[in-house]
Amino acid sequence: MDEQVTLPPVADLTEAGPLKDRFLQAISSGTSLTVDASAVQRVSSPCLQVLVAGKQSFAKAGGASLTITDPSEAFRETASVLGLLDALELGK
């Protein structure tokens, strides 16, 4: 079973907590998540940290996956500056 999470245009600290909670819920129920990052105009490091930790936690738990799709230019640029493209499996 797959579910989708859509990141808002401003994915900052206020989004990080609820996103973490959603990831934990999905991991515990074995639900794979797809994160749509196409609308992001600004993303903060706390939100990216939650996404990286989420990728790692899903991989460690097994049975479900976390995929980030359609990263916006702003999302990709911030992830690149912070050296997180590989950790988020977004390539170069």
Role assignments for model-derived ranges:
Residues 1-46, 52-92:
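STAS-like cytosolic regulatory interaction modules
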